[in-house]
Amino acid sequence: MAAIRMGKLTTMPAGLIYASVSVHAAKQEESKKQLVKPEQLPIYTAPPLQSKYVEEQPGHLQMGFASIRTATGCYIGWCKGVYVFVKNGIMDTVQFGKDAYVYLKNPPRDFLPKMGVITVSGLAGLVSARKGSKFKKITYPLGLATLGATVCYPVQSVIIAKVTAKKVYATSQQIFGAVKSLWTKSSKEESLPKPKEKTKLGSSSEIEVPAKTTHVLKHSVPLPTELSSEAKTKSESTSGATQFMPDPKLMDHGQSHPEDIDMYSTRS
């Protein structure tokens, strides 16, 4: 029993010491955590060091819609063009019918005689080309009908003729320009040599140039006697100037002796 009491007495102080040590360590950790200042707190989250932008890849549904759109785009554009053309044609014909109805409802006095002249001229063309070819059967009635229309309506016929002449001239100029451009392109292509021939010519010229220079150097022309004598005198004078040596006795060394030339600076 005495031993048990001694054990209890020894274990209780050890437990108290351990508890005090753990509490002290926790307090130290809390104090360390509270030492951070508000200015040092991060406002934003730090971005990753190795970031890379990756585009979103389209899915199967998007690829299918894109292929359908590209396949049907040209057909849709063609259908739109046809629809606009037909719509404009229908609107023009309806407007022409309305104008014709208004005009025929209250026609002028000379309308019926003029129409009679035009129809009679067309029938005359049919009768004259009755036994002819198909070309005559088409051209004769149209030609005589247009002739009657020009006689009956001269002002309108002149305006129509001017407009058609301008259109024909513009189209002819466009055709002429296109043909001329094609002709000039073909002529330029024919006139220009091939690049291989150019390289051959360049190499041959490069090889022949030194031969020509050597050939020119070989054929020397004799100079006249006067020029040769002048050249000789010039060469002699230059050689004499280079070979001239001054007399050391005549040289002025100042106050120094000629023997001490290495020790003092001389005057020239």
Curated annotation (Swiss-Prot):
Q: Which GO terms describe its cellular component?
A: extracellular region; MIB complex; MICOS complex; mitochondrial crista junction; mitochondrial inner membrane; mitochondrion; platelet alpha granule lumen; SAM complex
Q: Which residues lie on this side of the membrane: Mitochondrial intermembrane?
A: 28-110, 156-268
Subcellular localization(s) per the UniProt record? Mitochondrion inner membrane; Mitochondrion
- Transit sequence range: 1-27
According to UniProt, the name of this protein is: MICOS complex subunit MIC27
Membrane topology, as annotated: Multi-pass membrane protein
Bridged cysteine pairs (disulfide):
none
- Report the protein's function: Component of the MICOS complex, a large protein complex of the mitochondrial inner membrane that plays crucial roles in the maintenance of crista junctions, inner membrane architecture, and formation of contact sites to the outer membrane. Specifically binds to cardiolipin (in vitro) but not to the precursor lipid phosphatidylglycerol. Plays a crucial role in crista junction formation and mitochondrial function,.
Topology feature Mitochondrial matrix, residues: 130-137
State how it assembles: Component of the mitochondrial contact site and cristae organizing system (MICOS) complex, composed of at least MICOS10/MIC10, CHCHD3/MIC19, CHCHD6/MIC25, APOOL/MIC27, IMMT/MIC60, APOO/MIC23/MIC26 and MICOS13/MIC13. This complex was also known under the names MINOS or MitOS complex. The MICOS complex associates with mitochondrial outer membrane proteins SAMM50, MTX1 and MTX2 (together described as components of the mitochondrial outer membrane sorting assembly machinery (SAM) complex) and DNAJC11, mitochondrial inner membrane protein TMEM11 and with HSPA9.
* Keyword check for Transmembrane helix: yes
Phosphoserine PTM sites in chain numbering: 204
Which GO BP terms apply? cristae formation; inner mitochondrial membrane organization
